[in-house]
Structures are given as C-alpha cells and as structure tokens.
Amino acid sequence: MGMASGVFELNYGGKTLNLKEIKDYRLIEYGDLALMGEAGRPFLPVDNVLIAISSDQEPLGIEILKIEAETLRSVMPPPAPPPAPLVKKPDPFPEPDPLVYGGTGPYPSRLVEIAGTGHLFGQKVALLRVNVGRYLPAERSVVLLKALRFRLKSRKARDDGSRCRNADFVRKVVLNPEDVRVFAKNGDLEYVVITSESLSDEFEPLVRWKRQKGIRAEIRTVEWISSNYSGRDLQEKIRNYLKSAADSGLVWVLLGGDVSVVPHRIAFAMNSGANIFSDEDSIPCDLYYSDLDGTWDYNNNGVFGEVGDSVDLLPDVIVGRAPVETGSEASLFVDKVLHYEVESPEGYLNRALFAGEYLDWETDGGLAKDFVVGELPDGVQVCKLYERFNNLDAASFIDSINSGFNLVNHNGHGSIQVLCTGPDAIYPEDFQDLSNYPRLVGLFYSIGCWTAAFDYEDCMAEFFVLAQEGGGFYVGNSRYGWYTQYFPGYGSSDIFDRRFFGFLKSSTHRAGVALALVKAFMAPASRAENDFRWNEYTLTYFGDPEMPLYFADPESLRLEVAGNLNSGLVDIPVVLEAGEAPVPAGLAGLSDGQELLTSGYSDEAGFVLLHADLTGLDSVLLVGSKPGLRPVSRWVSVMEGPYVAVDTFYVSDENGDGYLAPGEAGTLHLSVVNEGNSDLYSLVAYLAPTDSLISVSDTDFAVGDLPQGATAGAEFPVVASQDLRDGVPTRLVLRLVSSLVR
C-alpha cells in the first residue's frame, strides 16, 4: 500500500471514546481528534490527513474500499456554536439547524473530502478531511469511524518540478512516510539570519555557534537583498531571496529584527466581526516568509493571503523572529539563545506552568489546558494555576515564572499590552521586571488576543523576550485568538495549541518546527475563510527556529576522536556518546572556531567519519550536539607527520553474502592508507571488540612499512555471536602502532 497503489489505511480503534452530557446533547470526545462543525450543525470528530504524492499526480476523488465503524445509538451531538474571537461576549447556547437535525441523510454527507494539494518542504501532498463522526438524524445515532481503507484516485498531470527538501519533517505529518524521498541536494546554506547592516555584528556570535555545531550558516542583510533581488517591496524581495535559498538547501530562517528592520506582510484570512480595532483583520504574518509557493497575491489586488490567492499554507522553511531594533536588544536575544542551549541550569527544565482562566462564564480555559497536559513529554511536571482553583492571579503567575519554569502555557484573554490572569492581569512592566535568569523560559505559548501584535510599537511578547533579567521565548497571536463557547478545548486556538505540543514532543524538540508542522497539519481545515485560516496567519514564534528545547535535565554529550589529527586532507573518526550509550543522529561539526570545515551525523553506533583539509591549521574545534542533550565542545591540536586512516573494509564469510549471521565465522579485510606527510615503518594493526557480539581470534596483524600516500591491507578472523541481531550496533576498535624510523 502507499503511493504506488494509491491505497491507504486509517485506524482510530485505539482512541478513547468519551460521551459528555451537555444540555440535551452528548458531546463525542474521541481521543485527540478535533471537533468541528458549521454553526448550528452537529459538532463532530474530524481528522486532517496529508498524503505524499508524486509531483505529476493530481487527485481526483476517493474510493472507499473498507469501513469499520461503531454506531452510537440514541446519541444526538450538540450544535456547533459559531467560532468567536476571545474578546466576544458569550452568546446563548446555539440552536440546532432544523435542515440537518430534522433531515434524513447523514451529516456530513461525505466520509472523506479532498481539500486540495500543496507543497510541504517541496514535497507535493494531497490534503484530506476525514469526517470520523457522522450524524444520522432519522435514527438519532452517530456512526463513529474505527478504521478505513481507501484509494486516492488520481490522474497523470504535468510534472510541477517539485522535489522534497526535508524528508524528516514531512514524514512526521504525512500518512505515508515511507513514500517520502529526498531528491534535492544539500547546498551551501542551511541557516540564515536576515537583518540590517547595523545589526549584523550583533548576530555574528549566533551564526558562529551554528557553524561550530556543523550548520552552514550566514547573515544576509536587507540592504544586500534589496540590491540583488526583485520584488514590489522589500517583503517580496526577501521572500524571493528565500525561494532561491530554499531550493539550495535552506532550512532555518531567523528574521533578525522588528518590523522596522525586517518588515512584516499583512495577510487577510476573513472578517472577524469583532469591530473593536480598525486593523483587526489585517494580520501581521510571518508564514509569508515560510510558505514560499506562489506570490500570496494571485489576483494581484494588493491584499495578501486571500482564499483566491492560492496560498497552500504549507511551510517550506522554518521561521522565527527576533523582535529587536537596537544593537543591545539584538545582543540580548543572541545571549539568551546561546545561554539556553549551552548553559541552562538543572532543576527546572522538566517544569511546566499552565494558566487557565474562564474565557466566559461557560468556558473554562483550565479544561483546555488539561488536554494539552496529555501532549507533554513523559516526566514533565505541571503546575496548574487555574481560575477554577482560585489560585490564578498576576502575582502568583509572575512569582511562578521567576521561580523557574521551562514551559509556560496560557489560556486566557489578552491584548497588545495586557495578558489576563483571571481576576487581574499582567502588564508590560511585569514582564520587564522578570528575574528568572538564568532559568530562561524555553517556550511561553499563549492563545490570548493580540499579545504578539509585533506590528505595534511593543507588545507583550516583545516585553517577555527582551526582559533584561529573565523571560525567554514566545509563541502567540498577532491578532485575535479564537475559542468555541461552551466547549473548552475545542476552539480553533485550543486545537492548534494542543497539536503544537504534540508535534513538539514528537518532532525535533524545536518550537519552530512544531509550529510549522501544526500549520501543515491544519491546512486541510484552513482552505476557506474561517478561524482555522486565521490561526495559520496569526501564530508567530519569537525565538531562534533551530534552537532545541529541553524537557529534562540533559545528559552531556561525550565526544571521542580516534588518534591524532594531522595536517592535510584527513579522515577524522568521531564517536558521540552519552552515559554509556552511543548517540545516533547526533551532529558533529568541525571548524576553525569561525568557519565550518565539515560536519556529519552519527550512525546507530554513534560513529561519524569527518573528512577535512587541515592544512595550515594549528588546532580545530569539534562540537557534538543533539536535541535533548547538552552539547560538547573540544579543541584538538593539528600535528605534522603521518596519518593512517581506514580506506575500505569488507567481510568474507562462509556463505559469501558479505554479512555475518549469528554464529557465522569470516574474515574482516581492512585497507589502510597513510594520508599524512611522512612515512611510517613496521606498522602493526590491533583489532579488539568492545562487547561479546563479535569475537576476534587473532587480534594483531603486521602491516609493515607504509610510505606517505601508500595503501596496505590487514586481515582478522572474526566470529559472530548467536546473540547478534539486525539493527543492534556493535563496535570494533582498531589500534595502529608504528615507528617513524626504520
């Protein structure tokens, strides 16, 4: 099954079903699924599904092959209330639509709907909505989907030339991760800071750290971009630059400045109907710099992001913003990023502070927070300040942050310079006076209205990020947040919130990645003028997009280098470990302290082989990193003289397949080369196992003399243990001993 056959399966059987009585209705809570419905129509579980398809494939329809479902009899779901901005006064409980509740056919009429297609990090995807719950009004029953097998029917279309650029991210969202393939080659740039010439020096330490870690990073000034790229304004020029850079391997984008430095794009999702601010429907939207398909103004009317503008809402790069205007603010932001990643103290990183107030007299934000608690990584301890518990107010909230919390989640009202805390509120001076340093908040997430309105002079998010002695990093709304009256946890802002933390746990522990993935996941629900589309535009991340978050006190990485480093072209064997275990998928970077020389990711045994030219260098810096572990740095001296590296190796075994099976004997053949600048004499190779999975019966082999540039072989009899298994790494240590003279 998969892309080749077009046949796919969904399974909901493991989800917990909860029927909750509300008025004369039964609310159907089904695992982590969202509840959706048009106003007055049944409020039912819905799933969003993304399917990776080929670039020359165009979906036509859905063929249902098999359905497993449960019928919930004598169950009438409540009518959905209209979505409401968090400033709206509560309406009466919604009246049911008589055309649906008095009808005869199922609602919704279709089990699966195709919402469109788009490109996620270059991968073409089909966007589907699955109506997991369907109401049968004539029987007063709900049919609840348990499993589904279907075919995505499609036709051959013109190849649009799209190619996946980041399979790891795409695979976390699509139904068929096995069909995702990376076609694009890595370029010379993975991370970029876009800032002004006047602020570029302040961002240099951050870029230097990225290079030291092994990430190809640069600074691009808005002045340089404006002079070298076309566009109707600076925003479009920046976006056109990002388009070309994304095609060459760009992943991470830090917008290094407030709107006076890196201008924002205003997007239109819909009319909110709040009628409070004249610019309330003009959403400052950094998704414009992340979703790089099209122009966002297809009809060329100067209004960006309209449904008719063919915005696919799927990110192509990961974006964060540093809301800084001065050199001192930029330095403060950079210092906080470096401090959090490298020096965060222990004792608070597994602590989360959840605040929930009554959004109205019928809607308890604390209940919405309880849904999010279930999405947190194991071991995270949650402190709940809920208006329902009578323990939420401004003083307790600020005191708690100052005591040290890594994650903060706020479900409450807000405005440009207000963040509400039940009976009272927090104001700019409260954030400015925070004193939680060195225990910076890795992530503060709020669904409150306007707290991240970064197009205004200063908003609450900016005060938090730029607090001199504390604060941290922030995700919030640049305009209204949205809720569903009477149904806490099921408003669109709640749904984004919950899914965000789910992706944060399952992705690369990066807030920027989680925000990109939740926007991709919600795209099938956001293709119309609705509050889901609004959330796509309004949610903004103030932080470094590549910075990983901790969820516990981190173990420190250990970095081992086999042998000495010699001048010239050399292979450098590096092993990454934590505790007593190897670290797979860790990044090892080699630099001269300023410029990146080479980098690579470790295999299952924690091993990575770096190849670099060390000519003219006295020492190099090795850095090992992996999200969730504390990075390690080590300066290593570069020596003149011989340098022996393993060139090739293979196994000749009893059955001739080149793989050692459990209990099988064979010979390990090694080829070594002298890549240094002098000769070696009387070289002897010693091979030793590090565990019982492989035994070596004759552990030394006399290689002989090895002149500069020469290659020689060595052979070792080996036997595999009966305990050897596929996917279980084992390590052999090769030691080479020689003389520099005859």
Protein language model annotation of sequence segments:
Residues M1-W635:
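Cysteine-dependent hydrolase recognition
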Residues P582-P584, N677-L683:
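Short acidic/proline- and small/hydrophobic-mixed sequence motifs that coincide with surface turns
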Residues T615-S619, A665, R725-R731:
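Extracellular Ig-like/FN3 beta-sandwich strand-entry sites
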Residues G624-E640, V719-R742:
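Terminal connector regions
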